[in-house]
Amino acid sequence: MILVRRELGDVLRDLRLQKGQTLRQVASKASVALGYLSEVERGQKEASSEILFAVAEALDVPLSVILSEVGERVAALEGFAPLRPIPDTVPDEFLSDFAAK
């Protein structure tokens, strides 16, 4: 069974290590108990949205980036291809077809 809390914990730990921060530093910046954050990173505790937001701010990473990474990891575990970003422009070939009509 896929546990989202494990994937979330892995993402948070990976980001923290990439940023070169200790668990203690992030817990302090986020005003979260060190032991609790450790349990979240190990996938043993579910984090509330408020805790996630505080940790994201402490890591200086948008919460949306964290959640997107978790979603991609869960999709991979489920055997789905990673989600592709939706383009914010209309491809030229569609514009030329539209203009011709």
What function would you assign to each model-found segment?
Residues 22-38:
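Short alpha-helical DNA-recognition segment
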Residues 68-101:
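Short, charged recognition helix plus adjacent turn
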